[in-house]
Amino acid sequence: MANNMREIKSRIKSINQMRQITKAMKLISASKLKKARAQLEETLPYYNKVKETIADILAHSAEVESRFFDIREEKEGKKKAYIVMAGDKGLAGGYNSNIFKLTEHEIGDNKENALLLVAGTTGRSYFSRKEYHVHTEFDYAVQNPTVFRAREITEIILDLYNKQEVDEVYIVYTQMISAISLEPRILKLLPIEISALREDVKADEIVLDQRLKYEPSVTEVLNVLIPKYIKGIMYGTFVEAFTSEQNARMTAMDNATKNADEMLQKLNLYYNRARQATITQEISEIVGGASALE
């Protein structure tokens, strides 16, 4: 009985220590999530204005030619680049595994024509182990999303696209629909679909003058604006992925803390019962010994 009590007491101590860790991780994730959301809200107006300007040009220009709108002719074996935004750490429920599943499903049997740019050490390890072509790795990019890092990745993919080393570029990330709903998504980045961009910016949001002239030409202006637009999407999805990961980890740690509380409640009950049984046994032995002396 005494050995059993010592074992229960040891388990209570271990679970208490684990509970302190999970509770601390939950609080850290909540703080990071709040900071990232504020960071995104500060930068969104600028990138929204860039998007509106591009939509205005498309709305008021007869024909627009740009390599970024170049829908390259259909062919077998199209080279596709995937920017995969995974986490640098685990303990976030199904956050990372859902991203991996979506990426593999999207690539399908076209593995030899898929080129990956992976943000996050978990993604790098997973896809390298599966023998995918990992072109570039970005450690701690999602953990610390910055405009500088978004520009760095944008320059790499634009270089690949302009050299026609890839025909299409996609971003795979997790969108936070709500505090309790996360959805892995895939977004086509290049080439830009003009119809989708026009639909994305409603007509009443375009406030620029129709008679506005762009110098030296519409094409040249677009070639300057579109990389900024892509960088904005890149940064926005980085922050979205970061907030989703923190939310997933916060939820996972909250559930772990609750499970620890339930286990502690049961173990304390077992410990008290064992202690009560020990005391009862000791009393019985004392009473039995006293009776034997009479």
From Swiss-Prot:
GO molecular function, one term: proton-transporting ATP synthase activity, rotational mechanism
Localisation per UniProt entry: Cell membrane
Keywords recorded for this protein, A-Z: ATP synthesis, Cell membrane, CF(1), Hydrogen ion transport, Ion transport, Membrane, Transport
Keyword Cell membrane: yes
Pfam families, per the entry: ATP-synt (PF00231)
GO biological process: proton motive force-driven plasma membrane ATP synthesis
Membrane topology, from the record: Peripheral membrane protein
GO cellular component, one term: proton-transporting ATP synthase complex
PROSITE patterns: ATPASE_GAMMA (PS00153)
Subunit-structure text: F-type ATPases have 2 components, CF(1) - the catalytic core - and CF(0) - the membrane proton channel. CF(1) has five subunits: alpha(3), beta(3), gamma(1), delta(1), epsilon(1). CF(0) has three main subunits: a, b and c.
Function noted in UniProt: Produces ATP from ADP in the presence of a proton gradient across the membrane. The gamma chain is believed to be important in regulating ATPase activity and the flow of protons through the CF(0) complex.
Family statement drawn from the similarity comment of this UniProt entry: Belongs to the ATPase gamma chain family.
Name of the protein this chain belongs to: ATP synthase gamma chain
Organism: Ruminiclostridium cellulolyticum (strain ATCC 35319 / DSM 5812 / JCM 6584 / H10) (Clostridium cellulolyticum)
